Amino acid sequence: MTVNGHHTNGVNGANGTNGHANGSNGINDTKAVKEIVPFVKPQVNFASAQRLEGCIHSLPELVDFNSLNNQHHTFCVQAKSSEPFDTITHGEFKVAVSKCAAWLKENLPIRPSSDDKALTKMAPVALFMESDIGLVIHEFALMSIGVPPLVLSPRLSPVAINALLEATGAASFIVSPRMSEPLKGALAALAAKGVSTHIGNPYKAYYQPGADPKSVAPFEVPQNPEDVILLLHSSGTTGLPKPIPTTHRQLLFAVNCHKFDTEEQAQSLNLSTLPLFHGFGLVAPGLSMSAGKPTLYPASDGIPNAKSIVDLINKTNAKSMMTVPFLLDDITNLPNEEGIKALVHMDFVGTGGAALGAGIGDRLAKGGVKLLNFYGTTETGPLSLTFAPTDNYDWKYFRLRTDCEYKIDELEPRDGERRFRLTVYPYGSEGFEISDQLIRNEQYPETDFAAVGRDDDVIVLATGEKANPLILETKLTEAPMVKAAIAFGENQFNLGVIVEPAEPLTPDTESAFRESIWPIITAACDQMDAFSRIPSPDAVVLVPAGVVIPRTDKGSIARKETYALFDKQIKGVYEQLLKAAADAVEPLDLDNLEQNLKSLIQEHLHIQAPASDWGVEDSLFDIGVDSLQVLQLRRILVTAASKTEAFKDTDCEKMIPPEFVYMNPSIREIAAALTKGSDGGDVSLEDAAKEVVELAETYSLKGVSAQEKAPSSSEGAFVMLTGATGSLGSHVAADLARRDNVAKVVCLVRKDKGTNQPPMPGGNPFDKKILKARGIQLTDEQFGKLATLEVDPTADKLGLIPMAYGMMQAKVTHVIHAAWPMNYLIRLRNFQYQFKFLRNLLEFASQGPAPTKKRFVFISSIATVARIGLAQPGSISEAPVSPSDSACGIGYADGKLVCEKIMEKAAQDYGGQLDVTSVRCGQMTGSKKTGVWNSNEQIPMLLKSAQGLGSLPQLSGELSWIPVDDAASTVSEIAFSDGSMPIVQHLENPIRQSWDAMLQSFGRELGLPAGKVPFGEWLDQVAAADGDDETFPVKKLTFFFKSFFQSVACGQVVLDTTVSRGQSKTLNAMTAVGDETVKAYADYWKSTGYLSK
């Protein structure tokens, strides 16, 4: 702690110490923090245009003040790729800025602006550097000598940089060593134009631990607070970035947007990932200078990602964070909620820029994270307050700061909501009207608002960048052949545009029209930011004849209504763009992988650095790859790997996760990780069993309950159903709706990202198309029993608001869990989403105020006992099995086994509240009533491949097929059976048939000869056949058909149904699948075009 100028080691920052970070030694060393030395608050004044006695009017003065009055308080901590980190005090920061200023004056042509109409008195110096303490030192060094820095975003194109340099009259250009490599050509071009170009020094050249600020002179005091001293930039109405001049007064306004209740809140470490080239990026160092809140900067030798940020939080015990929604989203979605756990202890987690999805925000808030909404504009600076929320503050709203004047005007209501306009007077009498329309929190009507739309309709892309489509829309509308144009792309990676022709088009004239407007689009895009450009003609939606773009009463295009009208076409655009990108990517060349990867990256990521300037061991981040390009690269790698023969049986999305490039940042590391991922290797049965046990223990309900509830009744049943869009689930929904004893069926639907669930259970009607597409007919009264409820399957309390969750618990009497992904290639650990879903459903069912037990039916699979059936002759009993006997190393089968174990544990520990059963299902076919059978299942795929080959395979053994509508009735009857349910039951047709007879029956319907070629040889013929996997769909699952199909489908595994037949009259009365049903299946596939007639 600081006492009379003396200091001790430590890095917390809250204690005013000077120690330098030794990784975890010091940053978390709370023993060293015995008391918090108050931070001497400076007397700043941004309201006055004239200098006042005793007041600070500029940031350089603030640096001097803190170097004398808060010398040993921590200014910032700069993290590095390896510890120890650098802790810089206010005294040391002052010395570093002074030394940097001396280097600037010695090496740069410091001169006044040559144009009388220039924005600044002195010619600016452009800074193109990483967002770390080095950039801060250079910024403040330039300001200290009266030279405005022009801070450039690393994402700017060369055209945009040139435009800003010309608009500001910049005399010099400083680039960091790391970012200089990709700009070699551009730097030479700038030098040729007379711009003095320099490679800047790293901050270590100026930072001197323990330096005495008294050893350097005070900075010269600026005489006019209205002088422009900083140039930021944004995208303006011209489409190119425009310079934003910022005065001394504006900067002081920006750094004073805080109100902390205690010194502990004010002085705790604040992690900032906000880019320093953005106006909000200066808030973090500003908090350090005005409130004593030290900033923690992530290491600058890579792009911050969710995992690295969480690791940094845990190492440093940072107590607050300022970040962007994109990164916060990734942090929230880290496995095992490690991101939320890292954030929950913080005083606040502030975010702004692009919108934070409601789903992510609600999830964080429910997890106890204190979210803070930032708001401001580039022109005004921050308008929201930075504080530690302690009241019932709602994160969806920002809280206005109260140290400046503003007025709120009410606008006309829109969409049933009151709307408001904010005008602020941040520094002087001149007001600035904000273009955003606002809504307000009626609990805090004077201070808490949320932005809901802009008058200028800027489109915020998925990256948080704001694209202004005015140039594009104007250029197109000015063309005589175009009546109207409106861009789209909110939360996407590219813009698209809807074009309404002046004259109606016919199918014959669409192509020519598209060709005629494309040069206009490309010319407009040449004047726009790179991220705002239309990527290809595929991103153009043409308004068909007879359709009119919606307009307001004033005649302007109604964007929201237009987007809704063309929602299907807009979605189609992005699907087509993804497909086009995928089509352009070739399979990986594993024999020459490193060079192949480099070529892929150079071609598709448009790396500025020439290929000759970087190698396979260089970090991609060192050659200028940014976070958006990381996303693009991951998509390219997944696509290329998916097309590669060696990976055909691999889930490439899982093999190459979102953090893959961050974890493997060089070509060599990517190649090694891919090669390692391809050898896979079989999982030993012992390891498979251990993994099943481990996952079952992890996801089982915790604790034991002795509470005993009364048995449930089947009358007036209120059923919660999952998987209602699938084959079995949709038939279960219909079967339940037809039953007189069922009052309601609520089908859980996975909530889309960023949407809100209805506040009351059963709030949304069931989509009738789901059932009608399967030929299922219900009366209006029966449809009325069906409803949907949007949930987040893995979120606490299913992501529902407490009222909805509680009411559902009170009403639901039965739960039928049928949702499950049909994929035999996914590894077991990739089913953890499903395990979390089951646990959440069991938690829901085992708790709540209902007086009776809930009956819970889990749909399992014959695959869980396939290993036992193959090893031992005879039927398998309806009883639990040991993982050591049944785990087989196949993710799908072992995943269902994990769930069975979770169900058994729930029955053991919560038997008083739950009556549970796992129903192992055998092979289900299509409906015997309608003939509808999903063409993406194994049997239809086999038959279509047989048509393509001209012959059926020879299959021996027996089959046990049950039509899906009979299976659905069986599930319902099990759920409503009398007495306690058996812990395990089997759902398989007890009547067995020969494969030979079944293939003969299908052969007659398809005109194919009986199978004479053994199945293995037949598969080889399919693999060698000249045709794609649309003609021969078995090719899509070659691994499954070769390895598992015969053992699973040909009667080697027999399920005993003695118990379940006692529970279900439908199952007890089952007959064989006859020729009429086979004909119905074949006729259905022919009617859809799947099979040839």
Curated annotation (Swiss-Prot):
Would you say which domain of life the source belongs to?
Eukaryota
Q: Which intervals of the chain are annotated as region Adenylation (A) domain?
A: 35-392
Q: What induces it?
A: Expression is induced on AF medium.
Q: Which residues carry this modification: O-(pantetheine 4'-phosphoryl)serine?
A: 627
Positions of region (Disordered): 1-27
Metabolic or biological pathway, per its Swiss-Prot or TrEMBL entry = Secondary metabolite biosynthesis; terpenoid biosynthesis
- Residue numbers spanned by region Thioester reductase (TR) domain: 721-971
Q: Where is the composition biased (Low complexity)?
A: 1-26
EC number(s) in its UniProt entry? 2.3.1.-
Q: Which GO terms describe its biological process?
A: terpenoid biosynthetic process
Q: What class of enzyme is it?
A: transferase
The protein's matches in PROSITE patterns, at most eight in alphabetical order, are given as: AMP_BINDING (PS00455), CARRIER (PS50075), PHOSPHOPANTETHEINE (PS00012)
Which Pfam family is an annotated match for this chain, by its short name? Answer: AMP-binding
Of which family is this protein a member? Belongs to the NRP synthetase family.
Briefly, what is this protein's role?
A: Non-canonical non-ribosomal peptide synthetase; part of the asc-1 gene cluster that mediates the biosynthesis of both ascochlorin and ascofuranone, a strong inhibitor of cyanide-insensitive alternative oxidases and a promising drug candidate against African trypanosomiasis. The first step in the pathway is performed by the non-reducing polyketide synthase ascC that produces orsellinic acid by condensing acetyl-CoA with 3 malonyl-CoA units. Orsellinic acid is then prenylated by the prenyltransferase ascA to yield ilicicolinic acid B.
Q: What is known of its domains?
A: Contains three distinct domains: an adenylation (A) domain that activates the substrate amino acid which is subsequently covalently linked as a thioester (aminoacyl-S-PCP) to the 4'-phosphopantetheine prosthetic group of the second domain, the peptidyl carrier protein (PCP) domain, as well as a thioester reductase (TR) release domain.
Q: Write the protein's name.
A: Non-canonical non-ribosomal peptide synthetase ascB
Organism name: Acremonium egyptiacum
Q: Which gene encodes it?
A: ascB
